[in-house]
Amino acid sequence: TVIQGYALLKLPQAEATQPLPRDVVKVTFTSGTTGSPKGVLLTHQQISAVTESLIEVAQITSDDKHVCVMPLAVLLENIAGVYVLLQAGAQVLIPSADALGMQGSGMDTPQRLLSMIIQKGITTVILAPGMLEGFINVIEAGHPAPTDLRFCALGGASVSISLLNRAAALQLPVYQGYGMSECASVVCLNAVNSNHIGSVGKALPHVRITLADDGEVLIQGGGFTGYCQNFGVGRWI
Protein backbone atom coordinates (compact mmCIF):
# COMPACT_ATOMS: atom_id res chain seq x y z
CA THR A 1 0.00 0.00 0.00
CA VAL A 2 1.31 3.44 -0.91
CA ILE A 3 0.19 6.60 0.90
CA GLN A 4 1.64 9.85 -0.37
CA GLY A 5 4.69 8.06 -1.66
CA TYR A 6 5.46 6.06 1.52
CA ALA A 7 5.18 2.30 1.52
CA LEU A 8 3.62 0.72 4.60
CA LEU A 9 5.14 -2.58 5.63
CA LYS A 10 2.73 -5.29 6.64
CA LEU A 11 4.02 -6.51 9.99
CA PRO A 12 3.10 -9.88 11.48
CA GLN A 13 0.38 -9.67 14.11
CA ALA A 14 1.89 -9.52 17.59
CA GLU A 15 0.78 -11.92 20.26
CA ALA A 16 -1.27 -10.46 23.09
CA THR A 17 0.83 -9.65 26.15
CA GLN A 18 -0.21 -11.34 29.37
CA PRO A 19 -1.49 -8.60 31.71
CA LEU A 20 0.03 -8.20 35.15
CA PRO A 21 -2.04 -9.13 38.20
CA ARG A 22 -4.24 -6.17 39.13
CA ASP A 23 -2.66 -5.60 42.55
CA VAL A 24 0.90 -5.15 41.20
CA VAL A 25 2.08 -1.57 41.80
CA LYS A 26 5.79 -1.82 41.00
CA VAL A 27 8.14 -3.89 38.87
CA THR A 28 11.78 -3.90 39.95
CA PHE A 29 14.58 -5.82 38.25
CA THR A 30 17.09 -8.00 40.06
CA SER A 31 20.80 -7.29 39.67
CA GLY A 32 21.40 -10.50 37.74
CA THR A 33 23.98 -11.84 40.18
CA THR A 34 22.93 -15.47 39.66
CA GLY A 35 21.50 -15.16 36.14
CA SER A 36 19.71 -12.80 33.80
CA PRO A 37 17.90 -9.92 35.54
CA LYS A 38 14.27 -10.72 36.28
CA GLY A 39 11.36 -8.33 36.67
CA VAL A 40 10.02 -8.82 40.21
CA LEU A 41 6.33 -8.03 40.69
CA LEU A 42 5.66 -6.13 43.91
CA THR A 43 2.16 -5.62 45.27
CA HIS A 44 0.74 -2.98 47.58
CA GLN A 45 0.29 -5.67 50.25
CA GLN A 46 3.92 -6.77 50.03
CA ILE A 47 5.34 -3.24 50.14
CA SER A 48 3.04 -2.25 53.02
CA ALA A 49 4.14 -5.28 55.04
CA VAL A 50 7.78 -4.19 54.70
CA THR A 51 7.19 -0.51 55.47
CA GLU A 52 5.09 -1.26 58.55
CA SER A 53 7.75 -3.65 59.87
CA LEU A 54 10.54 -1.14 59.28
CA ILE A 55 8.64 1.62 61.05
CA GLU A 56 8.40 -0.68 64.06
CA VAL A 57 11.98 -2.01 64.05
CA ALA A 58 13.69 1.32 63.30
CA GLN A 59 11.24 3.20 65.56
CA ILE A 60 10.43 5.76 62.87
CA THR A 61 8.20 8.67 63.93
CA SER A 62 6.90 11.88 62.40
CA ASP A 63 9.81 13.70 64.07
CA ASP A 64 12.37 11.95 61.85
CA LYS A 65 14.11 13.58 58.90
CA HIS A 66 15.62 11.38 56.18
CA VAL A 67 18.06 12.31 53.42
CA CYS A 68 18.16 10.21 50.24
CA VAL A 69 21.75 9.43 49.30
CA MET A 70 21.19 6.48 47.00
CA PRO A 71 19.29 6.94 43.71
CA LEU A 72 15.54 6.45 44.02
CA ALA A 73 15.81 3.68 41.43
CA VAL A 74 17.56 1.63 44.13
CA LEU A 75 14.77 -0.40 45.75
CA LEU A 76 16.31 -0.11 49.23
CA GLU A 77 16.20 3.71 49.15
CA ASN A 78 12.82 3.67 47.45
CA ILE A 79 11.14 1.47 50.05
CA ALA A 80 13.12 1.88 53.28
CA GLY A 81 13.90 5.53 52.68
CA VAL A 82 11.03 7.30 50.92
CA TYR A 83 8.02 5.05 51.54
CA VAL A 84 8.78 4.29 55.19
CA LEU A 85 9.40 7.89 56.19
CA LEU A 86 6.39 9.26 54.30
CA GLN A 87 4.12 6.58 55.76
CA ALA A 88 5.26 7.65 59.23
CA GLY A 89 4.57 11.31 58.42
CA ALA A 90 8.27 12.23 58.53
CA GLN A 91 10.32 14.48 56.25
CA VAL A 92 12.29 13.24 53.24
CA LEU A 93 15.05 15.36 51.67
CA ILE A 94 16.21 14.63 48.10
CA PRO A 95 19.27 16.85 47.46
CA SER A 96 21.22 17.18 44.22
CA ALA A 97 24.23 14.95 43.60
CA ASP A 98 26.51 17.96 44.02
CA ALA A 99 25.00 18.80 47.41
CA LEU A 100 25.60 15.20 48.47
CA GLY A 101 29.24 15.30 47.41
CA MET A 102 28.61 12.58 44.83
CA GLN A 103 30.74 12.10 41.73
CA GLY A 104 29.22 9.55 39.37
CA SER A 105 28.20 6.55 41.46
CA GLY A 106 30.73 7.27 44.22
CA MET A 107 31.04 9.77 47.05
CA ASP A 108 33.84 12.15 46.11
CA THR A 109 33.57 14.50 49.11
CA PRO A 110 31.91 12.71 52.06
CA GLN A 111 32.45 15.75 54.29
CA ARG A 112 29.85 17.61 52.19
CA LEU A 113 27.12 15.09 53.00
CA LEU A 114 28.30 14.89 56.60
CA SER A 115 28.00 18.67 56.94
CA MET A 116 24.50 18.56 55.44
CA ILE A 117 23.41 15.86 57.89
CA ILE A 118 24.60 18.05 60.76
CA GLN A 119 23.15 21.32 59.44
CA LYS A 120 19.74 19.88 58.48
CA GLY A 121 19.35 17.77 61.61
CA ILE A 122 19.06 14.53 59.64
CA THR A 123 18.04 11.56 61.80
CA THR A 124 18.04 8.66 59.32
CA VAL A 125 20.09 7.75 56.26
CA ILE A 126 20.84 4.66 54.16
CA LEU A 127 24.45 4.12 53.10
CA ALA A 128 26.43 1.56 51.14
CA PRO A 129 29.60 0.27 52.88
CA GLY A 130 31.87 2.44 50.72
CA MET A 131 29.93 5.55 51.70
CA LEU A 132 30.15 4.62 55.37
CA GLU A 133 33.92 4.18 55.08
CA GLY A 134 34.19 7.69 53.63
CA PHE A 135 32.16 9.01 56.56
CA ILE A 136 34.38 7.26 59.07
CA ASN A 137 37.59 8.48 57.43
CA VAL A 138 36.41 12.10 57.60
CA ILE A 139 35.29 11.85 61.24
CA GLU A 140 38.51 10.10 62.28
CA ALA A 141 40.39 12.98 60.62
CA GLY A 142 38.67 15.46 62.93
CA HIS A 143 35.32 16.37 61.33
CA PRO A 144 32.49 16.65 63.91
CA ALA A 145 30.23 13.61 64.11
CA PRO A 146 26.48 14.08 63.56
CA THR A 147 24.59 14.32 66.84
CA ASP A 148 21.00 14.10 65.54
CA LEU A 149 21.62 11.02 63.40
CA ARG A 150 20.07 8.03 65.18
CA PHE A 151 19.65 5.36 62.50
CA CYS A 152 22.11 4.70 59.68
CA ALA A 153 20.99 1.62 57.75
CA LEU A 154 23.71 -0.22 55.86
CA GLY A 155 22.96 -2.17 52.70
CA GLY A 156 23.73 -2.79 49.06
CA ALA A 157 26.84 -4.91 49.62
CA SER A 158 28.63 -7.02 52.19
CA VAL A 159 30.46 -5.12 54.92
CA SER A 160 33.54 -6.02 56.93
CA ILE A 161 33.38 -6.40 60.69
CA SER A 162 36.40 -4.11 61.00
CA LEU A 163 34.43 -1.28 59.36
CA LEU A 164 31.50 -1.87 61.71
CA ASN A 165 33.88 -1.82 64.68
CA ARG A 166 35.30 1.52 63.53
CA ALA A 167 31.76 2.91 63.32
CA ALA A 168 30.98 1.61 66.80
CA ALA A 169 34.15 3.20 68.19
CA LEU A 170 32.86 6.56 66.92
CA GLN A 171 29.42 5.80 68.37
CA LEU A 172 27.81 6.02 64.94
CA PRO A 173 24.33 4.42 64.96
CA VAL A 174 24.99 1.93 62.14
CA TYR A 175 22.60 -1.00 61.63
CA GLN A 176 23.38 -3.74 59.15
CA GLY A 177 20.60 -5.61 57.38
CA TYR A 178 19.84 -8.00 54.54
CA GLY A 179 17.29 -7.95 51.77
CA MET A 180 16.38 -9.02 48.26
CA SER A 181 14.20 -7.64 45.49
CA GLU A 182 11.74 -10.54 45.68
CA CYS A 183 10.96 -9.53 49.29
CA ALA A 184 10.40 -5.84 48.48
CA SER A 185 13.87 -5.05 49.81
CA VAL A 186 14.52 -5.60 53.53
CA VAL A 187 14.21 -9.07 55.10
CA CYS A 188 16.36 -8.77 58.23
CA LEU A 189 17.64 -5.76 60.15
CA ASN A 190 19.40 -5.05 63.40
CA ALA A 191 17.11 -3.14 65.74
CA VAL A 192 17.70 -0.07 67.87
CA ASN A 193 17.72 -2.13 71.07
CA SER A 194 19.38 -5.19 69.55
CA ASN A 195 22.37 -4.41 67.35
CA HIS A 196 24.93 -7.19 66.92
CA ILE A 197 28.05 -6.47 64.87
CA GLY A 198 28.61 -9.11 62.21
CA SER A 199 24.94 -10.04 62.09
CA VAL A 200 22.25 -8.88 59.66
CA GLY A 201 19.80 -8.86 62.54
CA LYS A 202 16.52 -10.63 63.09
CA ALA A 203 13.82 -11.22 60.50
CA LEU A 204 11.29 -8.40 60.23
CA PRO A 205 8.02 -9.02 62.10
CA HIS A 206 6.10 -10.06 58.96
CA VAL A 207 8.85 -12.43 57.72
CA ARG A 208 9.26 -16.14 58.39
CA ILE A 209 12.60 -17.82 57.65
CA THR A 210 13.28 -21.55 57.67
CA LEU A 211 15.85 -24.00 56.31
CA ALA A 212 15.15 -26.68 53.73
CA ASP A 213 16.55 -30.17 54.19
CA ASP A 214 19.45 -29.31 51.86
CA GLY A 215 20.32 -26.19 53.86
CA GLU A 216 18.73 -23.69 51.49
CA VAL A 217 17.31 -20.62 53.23
CA LEU A 218 13.58 -20.19 52.59
CA ILE A 219 11.83 -16.87 53.17
CA GLN A 220 8.11 -16.21 53.43
CA GLY A 221 6.19 -13.04 54.16
CA GLY A 222 4.19 -10.30 52.51
CA GLY A 223 3.04 -12.49 49.63
CA PHE A 224 5.37 -13.10 46.68
CA THR A 225 3.58 -12.66 43.34
CA GLY A 226 6.35 -13.78 41.01
CA TYR A 227 8.19 -12.40 38.01
CA CYS A 228 7.13 -10.86 34.72
CA GLN A 229 5.81 -13.67 32.51
CA ASN A 230 6.04 -16.07 35.47
CA PHE A 231 3.32 -15.40 38.02
CA GLY A 232 2.47 -17.43 41.09
CA VAL A 233 5.81 -19.18 41.52
CA GLY A 234 5.09 -20.18 45.12
CA ARG A 235 4.83 -18.92 48.68
CA TRP A 236 8.50 -19.44 49.56
CA ILE A 237 11.51 -17.65 48.09
In which residue ranges do the predicted regions lie?
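Gly/Ser/Thr-rich phosphate-binding loop
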Residues: Q87-A90, L114-S115, I122-I126, I136-N195, ...
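Conserved ATP/PPi-binding loop(s) of AMP-dependent carboxylate-activating enzymes
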Residues: S199, A203, A212-I237
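Alpha-helix/helix-capping structural signal
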Residues: Q45, G130-E133, A157-S158, S162, ...
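Conserved AMP-binding/adenylation subdomain of ANL enzymes
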Residues: S48-K65, L72-T124, P129-E133, N137-V138
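Conserved AMP-binding A3 loop
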Residues: V25-V50
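Short beta-strand->loop structural element characteristic of the AMP-binding/adenylate-forming
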Residues: T1-Q4, K38-L41, A90-D98, Q103-G104, ...
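Conserved pre-ATP/AMP-binding loop-to-beta segment of ANL
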Residues: P12-F29, S36, Q59-K65
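Structural core segment of the AMP-binding/adenylate-forming
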Residues: T1-Q18, I118
